Amino acid sequence: MGTKRKTHKNANLKHLYAKIRGGHVTRYHTRPELTNGQNVAAHTWRAMVILHTLWPEASKNCLLHMMYHDVAEIAVGDLPATTKWNYSEVHSILKRIENDFENSIGIGELFIPITVEEAKACDAADKLELVLHCYELITQGNKSATDVMNRGIKYLKEKYPHEKQVNRALKMIIRLYTMNK
């Protein structure tokens, strides 16, 4: 009885440690001029604030999904989005590895199911955080963030043309950007 309980407790601690370590992954490692010290933990917190602000009715599972959405990068790394876009077979394999890792620590889709609409809200919040991060870099004089910000805006406009929350946020960001140019 004691051994079984200790094994379960150790597994929980390993899962906890894996989840926490995921927050330490540095973002934009292939574009160091964009990092500005941002790691997965900072990005995730900001994305969760965006999600909760724009979609205040977001379910607990939706918020949990957002909280853990990049944790698997501790196991597989942060592959650049452009690589995923240009090599769908690599993206497919990476997604499978990420899902396996997430499920192994109790945070994958099997444990935290979300609806299609919630997945869209999480994706939009994730990309809006990217756009805001780049906007902040630009306002600090880092013009090298402009291309990434513009790609993020284009992605959001094309993928979510009828999503009111996304369009309102983009209008605000674009207005601020053009005012500060």
Map each language-model feature to its residues.
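Active-site helical microenvironments for divalent-metal-assisted chemistry
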Residues: 2-181
